[in-house]
Swiss-Prot record:
MF (Gene Ontology): holo-[acyl-carrier-protein] synthase activity; magnesium ion binding
Protein name, UniProt field: Holo-[acyl-carrier-protein] synthase
Pfam families: ACPS
EC number: 2.7.8.7
Catalyzed reactions per annotation: apo-[ACP] + CoA = holo-[ACP] + adenosine 3',5'-bisphosphate + H(+)
Cofactor dependence: Mg(2+)
Binding site for Mg(2+): 8, 56
Gene3D superfamilies associated with the record: 4'-phosphopantetheinyl transferase domain
């Protein structure tokens, strides 16, 4: 059963400007593993914007926004084919587990100007 959906869109230029002003903000939003993915990417601003948007979309699918947990409690990894995989930790995981067995489906896309993410929280 679908418990929640979330969508978020962001201008890539906003992310690029944030990176140019203070790259350290990445350490506040992303786990070490996510930062390793970022460092391997050629189009860093697009990649970061997509992942930022994904975390926002997942928080909306949980039905809470970022209440009771931080950005780092939602990690976006990828499988061998590059499909985004959501890993919930801390408060985000507690919220999802409160619904029972769960799975988060996620899609991320971008063009040169915007990144968008769509998340679906399924409970069983």
């Amino acid at each position: 059963m679908i418990k929640g959906v979330g969508v978020d869109i962001i201008e890539i230029n906003r992310v690029k400007n944030a990176i140019d002003r203070n790259y350290k903000f990445i350490e506040k939003l992303f786990s070490r593993r996510e930062i390793a993915y970022i460092k391997a990417e050629k189009t860093k601003a697009q990649y970061i914007a997509g992942r930022f948007s994904a975390k926002e979309a997942v928080s909306k699918a949980l039905g809470t926004g970022f209440r009771g947990f931080s950005f780092k409690n939602i990690e976006i990894h990828k499988d061998d084919l590059g499909k985004p995989i959501v890993v919930l930790n801390g408060g985000a995981r507690a919220i999802a587990e409160g619904y029972g067995k769960y799975q988060v489906q996620l899609s991320i896309s971008h063009d040169r100007e915007k990144a968008i993410a769509y998340a679906v929280l399924e409970v069983f």
